[in-house]
Amino acid sequence: MSGDPTVLVIGGGATGTGVARDLALRGVDVTLVDRGGLAGGTSGRSHGLLHSGARYAEDDPRGAEECLRENRTLREIAGTCLRETDGLFVRLAGDDPDYFEEKLGACEEVGIETERFDADEAQAVVPGLSDDVAEAFRVPDGVIYPSRLVAANAADAERHGATVHTDAPVEAVETADGAVSAVRVGGDVDAALRPDHVVNATGAWADRIADLAGVEVGMAPSRGVMISVEYDGLAPVLNRCRDPDDGDIVVPHEGEAVLGTTSVPVDDPDEYETADWEVERSIEECAAMLPAVAEAPEVRRWWGVRPLYAPDETGPNRRGISRGFTVIDHADEGVGNLHTVVGGKLTTYREMAEVTADRVCERLGVDAACDTATEPLPGADDPDRLDEFVDRYGGTNPTDAGVVSAAADDD
């Protein structure tokens, strides 16, 4: 390739493509590279929940507020990258009623709209809900199709002048005089790029890029399993209303239900063991809320790795680590043109990208406002067009394979 970009974004998940889109809309010359297809890491291997913030309301109100803001924004700009479903937090007979009240009160304090149901009302909302249900409350959860969301961000970035390269792994980072001087990119690029600024948006792999640049990022990744089973007719997301534990969420995916998940620390987000107990426990626990999933035919299973940022780890299974995000300025470590963005959730990718782009533009002296909260994604209301974008950038991923690939097969 010819020419060096002003900004090089490393990482083609939701956050990386969000940063590329944001910068491109501000008129910045940006190139994005990813070692594989887009959304192939954490973004496309999640359970696909559009968070209302309720899962974190009592323990992490900052993270909950971020989720709620972006939940509302994405409903305005992302169209059929999402599915509006609502969610229920379900207390079963053996679950702590005080925790239910604490969760409900925390949601209301954060500003999350809720509606309380007794057992009969909850079973009317969700046919097949366990007879052990004691009470529930509704929140504005939803479903994200990450392959579409990420591809639409990349397509809009390119429409505004960005360059996007898949199958382009970073092989080396050179520094000189207090800055990244060159980034060696392999694969289809096969060149040394010399950007003015670099954004490390590689999620659970952020410490690897940081290591290449001679700086530190304290990642504490954890793996979790998802099992998709055949299940028609589930309308809302189901969340078990108890202290966070394995198997506490069921996400509807158009004829399927995604059951999850576990939280097991891993040292290497590429090479880690998986265990049958994770699958068995997730199914058993989810079936406590929705019994029919215990015998439902399995469609697929996959593991994903959470990109948790924790210089000081919290808890043996890392469930206590904040789901808020952090933008790290590596100027403090002697590399003045490198930012890393870590943590956060798929739901908050756009805000993460905006804050990162603000920092980069400030460093570059670019005076341009962010438009991504109000500018709809291309093809937002046209699923066929969105799926064309998905094909362009590497195809579907496990989270939404049953939706995106099915739509493509119907063409």
Q: Where in the sequence are the language-model features?
A:
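Flavin (FAD/FMN) cofactor-binding and adjacent substrate-gating region
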Residues: 90-155, 159-160, 165, 173-179, ...
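N-terminal Rossmann-like FAD-binding beta1-loop-alpha1 element of flavoenzymes
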Residues: 5-32
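Central beta-strand plus flanking loop segment that forms part of the substrate or channel wall
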Residues: 50, 214-237, 286-287, 303-307, ...
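Glycine-rich FAD pyrophosphate-binding loop
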Residues: 24-46
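Flavin-dependent oxidoreductases
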Residues: 175-179, 185-258, 266-273, 293, ...
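Dinucleotide-binding Rossmann-like beta1-alpha1 core, especially the glycine-rich loop
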Residues: 47-126, 133, 245, 383-406
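Conserved Rossmann-like nucleotide-cofactor binding loop
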Residues: 15, 38, 205
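C-terminal catalytic lobe of FAD-dependent flavoproteins
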Residues: 242, 253-254, 270-277, 281, ...
